[in-house]
Every structure is written in structure tokens, then in C-alpha cells.
UniProtKB/Swiss-Prot annotation:
Keywords: Cytoplasm, FAD, Flavoprotein, NAD, tRNA processing. Pfam families: GIDA, GIDA_C_1st, SAM_GIDA_C. GO terms for molecular function: flavin adenine dinucleotide binding. The gene is mnmG. Belongs to the MnmG family. GO terms for biological process: tRNA methylation; tRNA wobble uridine modification. NAD(+) binds at residues 274-288. Gene3D superfamilies: FAD/NAD(P)-binding domain, GidA associated domain, C-terminal subdomain, tRNA uridine 5-carboxymethylaminomethyl modification enzyme MnmG/GidA. The keyword Flavoprotein applies. Homodimer. Heterotetramer of two MnmE and two MnmG subunits. The lineage of its organism: Bacteria, Pseudomonadati, Pseudomonadota, Betaproteobacteria, Burkholderiales. It comes from the Bacteria. This is tRNA uridine 5-carboxymethylaminomethyl modification enzyme MnmG.
Amino acid sequence: MLYPKEFDVIVVGGGHAGTEAALAAARMGCQTLLLTHNIETLGQMSCNPSIGGIGKGHLVKEVDAMGGAMAAATDEAGIQFRILNSSKGPAVRATRAQADRVLYRKAIRTRLENQPNLMLFQQAVDDLLVEGDRVVGAVTQVGIAFRARAVVLTAGTFLDGKIHVGLDNYTGGRAGDPASVSLSARLKELKLPQGRLKTGTPPRIDGRTIDFSVMEEQPGDLDPVPVFSFLGRPEQHPQQLPCWISHTNSRTHDIIRGGLDRSPMYTGVIEGVGPRYCPSIEDKIHRFASKDSHQIFLEPEGLTTNEFYPNGISTSLPFDVQLELVHSIRGLENAHILRPGYAIEYDYFDPRALKASLESKAISGLFFAGQINGTTGYEEAAAQGLLAGINAGCYVRERDAWTPRRDQAYLGVLVDDLITRGVTEPYRMFTSRAEFRLSLREDNADMRLTEVGRELGVVDDVRWDAFNRKRDAVSRETERLKSTWVNPTILPAEDAVPLLGKPIEREYSLADLLRRPEVVYNDLMALQGGRHAPEVPLDGDPLLMDQIREQIEIGVKYHGYIARQAAEVDKLEANESTRLPEGLDYTEVRGLGFEVSQKLNQHRPETLGQASRISGVTPAAISLLLVHLKKKGLGRTRSGNSQEAA
């Protein structure tokens, strides 16, 4: 049957990508339908019970800066919070939280059910409605046809998914859920390029059977307690729990080696490539044969369960081998396994067939986000979902797509890497992937993206008000620090030495003093009984005050480095944003070799910058392209969220 109501946007899948996509499109005012095979698993954390980490936490902050749900849900569900790399520079500091699975799922579902313009429907999708080269809807497994102007696919690991435990395997999207076989077949029928990847998960353990007394306790950060959302507060956090650390040993490794003849990875049963940066324990033993042990983190799954997630022993070995290897680990000698570990193999679709908006180049109105694009991780999925949802909304409203630049957001780095380089293994975000990471910090994600989000219609009044107060206070106080001067008379030696280590010998601005490595903002403001503090408090909200102080301090201390990086961005920007005509035949560009023109015709980059990052495209080829564009008068430039003729 044809459903009587037509929608603007349909989102297929209710994981981390799908929920952010649906919420974003609905916040933009689009009539949105989220189709999921099971409403009870909306926002399900399919693998580890944690959010964030190096590079990943940056993505979560960016999603939050644009009104997304992941950070706020984590603040409500997080049972341990830590700042990683806290002793290092601000560019690589990252927030990570353990989350209660049940509370996280509840937080996401609450937001979905209360979001205006968004409807939920429980049915798996088997088919897409395509007319010509345009998607017009989706069909569920019982034949209900829903029509829409745009469709966002966020199918995760469900597309033709196959679960492996030892040499046994069966179809499934994850443990306990069916695979999406018909939809995968339909996408292949549409001639969309695809491949096969795999990921895995460890056995889960009953905490009542773990001997924590022989393990190292790992508590969360307490002073201060971190929050994920720019609007989050520590008092939102539920009860906090520690994690625990143990290690594999030589006996563990011998057990694993003895089981490799029944490993689906090492017997050729699994064809898909697994994630390099989250390898299975059998892969670790093989790749790092000289290591005597590997660290294992015992992570609590929640406040109302005894289940623990042993991070570090993801495996698809037969269950009898899993049992033996778990029992060989200190503290787990008597452990009871609640669920066996497994690997899952699934279809992904080549992201090089997508525009920077995550819209298919072949089928108008069809967007892809999450693991279907070859990524791994909740955070990477959520960020893509946000972008796909926004651009589906822009497509429906006939507005230009928003495509963040590499110097603007980790989301820009992520998407640019995917659409220019593709994937040969599941893609994970790291800070090292960003050329301009000093400017792409967790702490300034809102400064980079909230204004853009407001223009796009995804940032509400509460967030916008808090952002403006923060931005104005940072600007006002930074200027005051630059224009307030002290000299040896105003700041005598007896006051200067405790803070600076020596007297000042000439006149300095307060910004000059703050730039010194040993000086922090609060101490500078407390100097001489608060004589140099602002007359009016920066903000009445203590949480916002902390963010404002952090922004001021980083901005002043790293001003020179940030300014140099901004100059580098300006130099690159002209070529980076020069648009390439959609119909350009690269074989007609004089001087381009056959291989280069073939690759460019195959991948159809949207900008000169994207073309430069395609494997095999040389700087000389980019110069030839630039000459060709100028000669033909074809070059156009692209801004951060609009496209216009130069």
C-alpha cells in the first residue's frame, strides 16, 4: 500500500547516524520519517559502552555545537568521564565517557519522540523507490510504500550482514537482530559500487565472577568532572563507576595461536577487512608477536546490570577457545561469559561515489551516512548523520548544500577523506588526520560551527543565547587583557615574583603576562587581591565561565601558532575551493596523462582541492587543471556553506 502522507525526508536506520540525521532534518522544519526495524533499539550502542576518545571526542563536540544529541545524551547516561591527553596541548585533548547502555538509549529515544516534525515507524526497509535518476521513497518488508523527496540510508552493519563465531556463521545485522539482505541487493541492482568490511566485538562477562582485587582500578576524573555538551552540567551525570585494568599473558597468547586453525579470519572464511585501529585479539597476537602482554579494560555496561565489556579482546574464535582465553587472564579465572564474542561481515558502499554533501552522485536525493560509507565508530557515524540530515533538508528546501572544509571541522576532514580517498579498511578518526588541528580543538567546536548551525536552522534559541554570551565575553575580555598594562610600579616585585617567578622589568599588557607558560588566567585575575580582574563578571553561569576562561587562555597563549595556521589556510583556500564543472571531460585537458584523466573521470571531484587528494593525481596535474579552468573561464569558488560563481 501507499502510505497516505508524503514526507520531506525519510531516514532508514535508527543507530547513531540515523538518529542524528532524523533530528537534524526535523530541526530544519522538514517533515521527517525515521524507519527502523525495532523502535526498542533506537540509539543502541552495538559494541563498546563508551563515547569519545582521541579525534572521536572532537566529532562529538562538533555534533553538539550544531544542536546534535550525542553529547547531551552522554551527559545523561555517562557513568565515567575522563579527559585524555590532559597533560598535552589543547589540540589533542579529548573527552571520553563510559555510558550506561540503557540510559543512553532512553536519552536518545526521548529526544526522538519529542522532536517536532519527526515521526517514527517500526518496519525494516527492503526497497527504494527510484524514478529515473531520483529517489522518491522507500518500501518496507510488508510492502508499505512511503514517498519522500529525500532518503538518508544509515544501515550500519546490517546490509547483508553475516555473523561469525569460529567456523560457524549465520546472517544477522548484529547479535539478536536480522540482516538487511533485500535492501543490500537493491542497492547492488542500482549499480552502486560496494565492497565488504568486517568488525568484531568481545565476549561479555558477568561482573559477579570477576576478581577485581587483583586488577588495577581506573577511576574517572573528579576535579573537575568533565561534561560532553557545551550546555552540559556535572549534576546531570548518574552515579559514577570505575573501570578496571588487567592484561593478557603468554598462556593467553598460546591459547589464541592454538585456535587460529578454526578462526574465520585466518582460514579465509571472512573476506572483509577489519579495522586497523581496533584489531581483534587474534590479530594483535599475529601483528605484535614480540609483545608479552596486551592491556584489557574491564568496562561496566551500566548501573542496573552486572555485565562487563572486556575492551581489548574482540574475537571471532570458537566459543571453547574464547572460554579458555578469558580464563587465562588474571582476575578472570572463574569468569562466566554472558555473550560470546563474534565478528560481523557486511556490505559498505564506496564513498567516492558521493558528493561532499553525502548525496549520491548517481541518484539525486539519496544520502548515505555512517558505517555504510566504510567508517567505524559511533562518533564518526553520528557526525555523518548530522551532515546527511542537514543536506537532505537543504536538498528538500532547494538550498545549497553545506560542506564543511578541512580547516573548519573534523567533520570536514572525515568527509573529504572518504570521498577523495575511499576506504580499504574501516575508517577511524584521529587528530593526526587533520592538517589544522590546532584550530580544530574540542573547546572551540562551538566557535567554529554554532553560527553555521544557526544559519542552517539546526541550533535552537537556548544554545544560540549561550553561544552569543560566551563569544561576546571571550572577545570583550581578550581585548581588555590586551589593552590593560602593568609596570614595575603597578606590579611591584613582591607581587610579581610569586606568580611570575621574577619581577617585571618593563611595561607589559595582561595578555603578555598570560602568554607565559606558567601563568593561568585565574591566578592572574587573583593577583594583588583581584585588582586586575574585570569589573563585571564574564558571565553569571559558572559552567559558561569555565568555558570562557579556557577560550581566553588558549587564544592568548597560542595566538602566534593559530595566526600562522590561519595564514596557511588562506594560502591554500583559493585552489582548495575552486569548483570543477560537473560535465568536465578530463581527457580534453591538455597534458593530463591517461591514468590521471581516467581517475578524475571516474571519481568526479567537486573541487580542485578534492582532486589533489585523489591517489595518483600529482601537483603538476593540478596545475594543468587550473590553467585549463582559467583558459575556459570555468573556475568557481566555494564558501564554507554556499557555492557561488567567482
